[in-house]
Amino acid sequence: CGISAMADAQVTESLKAIGMENIRCAQTPGVTTVSFENNVYRSTYTGVGKAIDACLGSKTKGDLQLVVLENRIPRLCINLPDTLTEAYRNGEISLIQVYQQMGITVDTDAAMKALKNAGQEEVPSAWKVDLMIYPDLFLENNTFDELYTYAINLNPAVEMALWKGGKMTAQVILPVATNLSGEMKRIRPGIIALSQDVRFRHNIFGKMTVGNFTNNRYGAQLEIKYRTNN
């Protein structure tokens, strides 16, 4: 138990050190299961790669399975058998070879069950506010007297993670340059919305969004997706 607790703490601290959030770790016979959320690296793949590298640097025993969260909803499960982790730690294979040989699936049910009694999340993202800036470039060629109509905007947004799957977004559009007139030259609201993600069993995902969308559209949007295990 002491060794397992030490390994859990080491994995958790390694993930904290690279900025991961919503971290949980649990030991079951022969398997270390870890869940985390990447809100640091803009590329999901970069974030996952950093997390794998951090976990491989920890002294886990047995197989290693990582659950990748998005807005605290499980999205992917990455499986690294003990033969693979030991080969990497012994210098027999490279990190690239680990990526090539590890298993990836959308089916996270078993892994999340293993984390059921893992306790509170470390570095929770709930009620955390992020300030994002999105560049926006619009080009259109539909007139004979001008080569292009264009608009360049900066769209700062405040994004707040709420409860599990819940998110609030408030965005403003700041025009930088344009040859259009009217509203396109004015500061105006962008996306102001509240969304809720849900994961059902058997890889079915749902998302409901209500609020103000682009182009002055108000309303609600419902998405349902199914993903195969691969």
Regions found by a protein language model. Give the residues of each.
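Feature captures outer-membrane beta-barrel proteins of Gram-negative bacteria and organelles
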Residues: C1, I152-L162, I187-F200, Y218-N230
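Transmembrane beta-strand segments that form the barrel wall of outer-membrane beta-barrel proteins
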Residues: C1, T33-N38, L131-T143, M168-V176, ...
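Short edge beta-strands and adjacent turn/loop segments
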Residues: T12-S35
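Solvent-exposed loop/turn segments connecting transmembrane beta-strands
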Residues: R42-T44, N142-Y150, K164, P175-R188, ...
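Short, non-transmembrane amphipathic alpha-helical segments
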Residues: S43-D63
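A short amphipathic beta-strand at an alpha->beta junction
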Residues: L56-L84
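Outer-membrane beta-barrel biogenesis signature
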Residues: I93-V129
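Core alpha-helical transmembrane segments of integral membrane proteins
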Residues: E122-L180
